[in-house]
């Protein structure tokens, strides 16, 4: 697929904001979804590393040290480049340098998903994923780590902002409306 004719929807948001819900809606609309964290999980599998949150964070840092700060974006972009879909969604962009990698592949649109820290903390506690913070202090530290990657800059410069303080059903409807508008399906 020629880059000039490809739309790449880049999704950014803090942990617990609702990025995976937006990705699920995209999948249900037939939009291929690339989750940047999957690149790190694949590398862990390749190296025989148990995919615990601590190991994955350590491996992500190591990959960036070994191959540069955009290595995860570059590997994701490589997969997109061999995809013939005219619209794709990338879940988990964390820095403007990563955005620049995807801009080489086509037209990019950044969608930020935002929810207040208290809302996100409660969601994270309820979802109970392995490795999720269980205390407010752990949660705040994880936020600072994410912001240290430059995530706040991506969110601040987003083309669209979905505020997710709503019920799941209301957020899903908002997400579907936005994706329909972006993809011409609505």
From Swiss-Prot:
Keyword line: ATP-binding, Nucleotide-binding
Keyword Transit peptide in record: no
A GO MF label: ATP binding
Gene3D superfamilies to which the protein is assigned, alphabetical: P-loop containing nucleotide triphosphate hydrolases (3.40.50.300)
Pfam families in alphabetical order: AAA_17
Entries under InterPro entries matching the protein: NTP_hydrolase-rel, P-loop_NTPase
Disulfide pairings: none
Residues the record lists as binding ATP: 13-20
Top-level lineage group: Archaea
Family membership: Belongs to the UPF0200 family.
Protein name per its UniProtKB record: UPF0200 protein Hbut_0338
Organism expressing this protein natively: Hyperthermus butylicus (strain DSM 5456 / JCM 9403 / PLM1-5)
């Amino acid at each position: 697929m020629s880059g000039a004719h490809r739309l790449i929807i880049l999704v950014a948001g803090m942990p617990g904001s609702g990025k995976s819900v937006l990705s699920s809606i995209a999948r249900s609309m037939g939009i291929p979804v690339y989750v940047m964290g999957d690149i790190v999980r694949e590398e862990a599998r390749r190296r025989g590393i148990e995919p615990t949150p601590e190991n994955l964070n350590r491996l992500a840092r190591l990959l960036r040290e070994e191959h540069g700060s955009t290595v995860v974006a570059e590997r994701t972009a490589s997969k997109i480049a061999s995809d013939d879909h005219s619209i794709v969604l990338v879940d988990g962009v964390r820095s403007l340098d990563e955005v620049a990698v995807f801009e080489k592949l086509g037209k990019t649109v950044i969608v930020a998903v935002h929810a207040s820290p208290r809302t996100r903390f409660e969601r994270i506690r309820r979802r109970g994923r392995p490795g999720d913070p269980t205390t407010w202090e752990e949660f705040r530290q994880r936020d600072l780590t994410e912001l240290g990657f430059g995530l706040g800059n991506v969110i601040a410069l987003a083309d669209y902002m979905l505020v997710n303080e709503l019920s799941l059903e209301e957020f899903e409807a908002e997400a579907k409306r936005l994706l329909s508008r972006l993809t011409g399906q609505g």
